[in-house]
């Protein structure tokens, strides 16, 4: 999983620190079996945790994935759920009772969790029939009068409010503990919080000054009659102030809060982290120590002299601790206006996406051409070595600052593990007679990339070709979709699945996620998928989103085709309802493997799309490959017409 090439983000790039060793092996609920080579033995950790629970008079303890900023990706010091359970996927929640331990996660991680959890854990496969969410489990499955221990800095205030309402009729309640019990069990071995350098992102990349962004935010605050907004999400702080850091692996963010009023902006950060570029460009922004945030929030309502009609805004992922510090009657939970502003990229950011993806395409072509040559020569290459080589090619690109996530390099059955991460000490050899799935991305000063391509360097089976072609048809259906303004990703998700459904196939993940601009590779609030929450955010011109349908045959192979698309306005012959219509612009430039295509399944429009996509890829990427005969000839072959 963890590879030897480390990078550091500052003006010099992103560094990957050595991680803790957590690499460890369906019905809707699965009790894990005996410990295996990939399993962390959690017996002692759970025993210590339960003893602490007893001392604090709680009968259950909740260990969410997120940190106190509700981050999806975490610094090593915040990987509490991974420490206590052994499961290190990016999504999930652990609930420990006096005699049982439950791990809740979604379909992306079922196979991974089954491999990593030991016999102490029961896997709860969220999304399958009769499996509750972890929130529902607390009030539906636990008995009455249950004291449920939580860390208020890790639980969203919105979740706490709804849970409290549900638990009250059963005389159960959430108990905010002064210390995180998992941290106590972890003890001195728990890593310290990173405090890496923070730098200014020049306006030639961001396209808008931080002062303009703050002015726009204040206009949104006026609409909501707010005197202040507390910014808790790390990517929102970074975007608002045009700052970038490296406190969390793969994500150019840093630990900080911000409080914006009509008169001032305060950044709560360890000031020693700010380099000269950051200090010189933080005009009209005050700084205070990171740890001072809660004390400041305690006094905020008095300082602002809030009345019945004026409130402090907090986002819907802000923690219960933040809400409690402000005071019960002084805040309003809203969907973060910064999330909506950040989601729509400006012209500079959109052009950065185009250019960074073209450069990224050159690295991908070099890698796949190299890999095919090595396999044809009989060279033994394992999944981790392949990922390392791809990273090496990317590291040569202009404006590269590191990976945007850990490369998923999976051959054969490992490709069916949706978020598989190869362990250099225990991973498979890439074989010519197996399907190979590679999902990877980079962080660049002018954009963030995320691309998946699936290959077969030998002779694929009819089953593999048919499945790949159905996935391709879904990919094309999204790419060519035209829809009226006001349409959500929830509505168009079925376009990606239609061809798979014809064969009785499907996949257990969303079709698309938003992508940050030199920020987190997963960004909301929009996306394409079946989660009902995605029906709350219409797709708008300027948004970026992935297009990644897939199919996974457990124990055999995995297929995914992923490109990044920009939402754009399109001209249509008519304009019913004067709504205006939208479509997509594909910016990912990497061939789609024709060796896996069953051409007989494609209609003429789909064939035309594939040929035109390959012609565009050749035109844009080939100029970057001058002098690399191997890559050029490979690209020429892969981009030739059907």
Swiss-Prot record:
UniProt-listed InterPro entries: Creatin/AminoP/Spt16_N, Creatinase/aminopeptidase-like, Creatinase_N, Pept_M24, Pept_M24B, Peptidase_M24_C, X-Pro_aminopeptidase_P
Any GO BP: proteolysis
EC number(s) recorded for this UniProt protein: 3.4.11.9
Gene Ontology molecular functions: metal ion binding; metalloaminopeptidase activity
State the Gene3D superfamilies in the record: Creatinase/methionine aminopeptidase superfamily, Creatinase/prolidase N-terminal domain
Q: Does the keyword Transcription apply?
A: no
UniProt keyword annotations, A-Z:
Aminopeptidase, Hydrolase, Manganese, Metal-binding, Metalloprotease, Protease
Catalyzed reactions per annotation = Release of any N-terminal amino acid, including proline, that is linked to proline, even from a dipeptide or tripeptide
Q: Does the keyword DNA repair apply?
A: no
Which Gene Ontology cellular component annotation is one that this UniProt entry carries? cytoplasm
Which Pfam families does this chain map to?
Answer: Creatinase_N, Creatinase_N_2, Peptidase_M24, Peptidase_M24_C
Q: Give the record's family classification.
A: Belongs to the peptidase M24B family.
Q: What protein am I looking at? A: Probable Xaa-Pro aminopeptidase P
Q: Top-down, what is the taxonomic lineage of the species of origin?
A: Eukaryota, Fungi, Dikarya, Basidiomycota, Agaricomycotina
Q: Which gene encodes it?
A: AMPP
């Amino acid at each position: 999983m963890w590879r030897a090439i480390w990078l550091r983000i500052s003006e010099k790039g992103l560094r990957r620190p050595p991680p803790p060793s957590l690499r460890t092996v369906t019905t809707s609920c699965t009790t894990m079996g005996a410990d295996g080579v990939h399993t962390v033995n959690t017996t002692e950790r759970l025993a210590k945790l339960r003893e602490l629970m007893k001392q604090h008079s709680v009968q259950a303890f909740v260990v969410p994935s997120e940190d106190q900023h509700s981050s999806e990706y975490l610094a090593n010091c915040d990987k509490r759920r991974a420490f206590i359970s052994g499961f290190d996927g990016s999504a999930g929640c652990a609930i420990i009772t006096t005699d049982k331990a439950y791990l809740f996660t979604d379909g992306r991680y079922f196979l991974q969790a089954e491999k990593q959890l030991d016999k102490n854990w029961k896997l709860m496969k969220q999304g399958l029939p009769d499996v509750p969410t972890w929130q529902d489990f607390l009030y539906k499955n636990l008995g009455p009068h249950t004291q449920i221990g939580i860390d208020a800095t890790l639980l969203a205030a919105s979740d706490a409010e709804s849970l409290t309402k549900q638990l009250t009729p059963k005389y159960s309640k959430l108990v905010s503990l002064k210390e995180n019990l998992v941290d106590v069990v972890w003890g001195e071995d728990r890593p310290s919080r990173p405090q890496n350098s923070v730098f200014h992102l020049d306006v030639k990349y961001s396209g808008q000054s931080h002062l303009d962004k703050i002015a726009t935010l204040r206009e949104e605050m006026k609409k909501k009659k707010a005197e202040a907004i507390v910014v808790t999400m790390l990517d929102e702080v970074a975007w608002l102030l045009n700052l970038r850091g490296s406190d969390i692996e793969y994500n150019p963010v840093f630990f900080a809060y911000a409080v914006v009023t009509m008169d001032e902006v305060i950044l709560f950060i360890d000031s020693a982290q700010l380099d000269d570029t950051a200090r010189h460009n933080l005009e009209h922004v005050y700084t205070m120590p990171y740890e001072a945030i809660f004390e400041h929030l305690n006094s905020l309502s008095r300082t602002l002299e809030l009345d019945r009609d004026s409130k402090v805004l907090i986002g819907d992922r802000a923690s219960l601790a933040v809400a409690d510090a402000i005071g019960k009657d002084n805040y309003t939970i809203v969907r973060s206006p910064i999330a909506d502003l950040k989601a729509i990229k400006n012209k500079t950011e959109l052009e950065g996406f185009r250019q960074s993806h073209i450069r990224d395409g050159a690295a991908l072509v070099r890698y796949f051409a190299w890999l095919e040559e090595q396999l044809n020569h009989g060279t033994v290459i394992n999944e981790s070595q392949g990922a390392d080589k791809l990273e090496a090619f990317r590291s040569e690109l202009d404006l590269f600052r590191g990976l945007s996530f850990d490369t998923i390099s999976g051959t054969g059955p490992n490709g069916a593990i949706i978020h598989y991460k190869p362990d250099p000490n225990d991973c498979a050899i890439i074989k010519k007679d197996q399907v190979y799935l590679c999902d990877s991305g980079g962080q660049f000063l002018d954009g963030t990339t995320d691309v998946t391509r699936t290959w077969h360097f030998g002779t694929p089976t009819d089953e593999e070709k048919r499945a790949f072609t159905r996935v391709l048809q879904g990919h094309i259906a999204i790419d060519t979709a035209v829809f009226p303004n006001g349409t959500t990703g929830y509505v168009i998700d079925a376009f990606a699945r239609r061809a798979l459904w014809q064969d009785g196939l499907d996949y257990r993940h969303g079709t698309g996620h938003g992508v940050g601009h030199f920020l987190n590779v997963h960004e909301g609030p929009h996306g394409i998928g079946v989660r009902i929450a995605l029906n709350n955010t219409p797709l708008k011109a300027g948004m970026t989103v992935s297009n990644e349908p897939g199919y996974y045959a457990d124990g055999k192979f995995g297929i995914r085709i992923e490109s990044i698309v920009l939402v754009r306005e399109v001209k249509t012959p008519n304009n019913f309802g004067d709504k205006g219509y939208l479509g997509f612009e594909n910016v990912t430039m990497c061939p789609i493997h024709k060796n896996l295509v069953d051409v007989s399944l494609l209609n003429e429009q789909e064939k035309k799309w594939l040929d035109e996509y390959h012609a565009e890829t050749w035109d844009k990427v080939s100029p970057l490959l001058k002098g690399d005969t191997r890559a050029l000839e490979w690209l020429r072959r892969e981009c030739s017409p059907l």
